[in-house]
A protein has these predicted regions:
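Charge-dense, helix-prone N-terminal extensions
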Residues: 1-109
Length: 109
């Protein structure tokens, strides 16, 4: 069972990740925001690609639910931390971070 401390530790372990205020939440960004932690620290919103969101929500509906708004249609997904193992949380955050990570600069020849 994961908690907010696990979430924060894992999210900040990715290269280039930082924690920033975001309205009433805490945002975790690399190049762009890939996750936010709720004020009560019981849930988090994680940014998947829409094609990644559907199977996540179907396989683990107790852990993942698409946000019921335009952000949800873009892949933002609510994760209930207590319903996730630490390994599941890490896999979800890594998936989101990969989309937000700084792009490698092209090498000059």
């Amino acid at each position: 069972m994961a908690n907010a401390a696990d979430f924060r530790r894992i999210a900040l372990s990715f290269e280039g990740a930082g924690e920033y205020p975001h309205f009433d939440r805490r945002a975790f960004k690399a190049r762009v925001t890939f996750a936010t932690l709720a004020p009560d620290e019981l849930s988090a919103n994680i940014k998947f690609a829409p094609e990644e969101q559907v199977p996540k929500c179907a396989v683990a509906p107790d852990a993942f639910a698409a946000l019921e708004n335009a952000w949800g249609r873009r892949g933002w997904t609510c994760a209930t931390l207590a319903a996730l193992s630490e390994a599941e949380l890490k896999a979800a955050l890594e998936m989101a971070w990969r989309h937000a990570a700084p792009k490698a600069k092209p090498r000059r020849l």
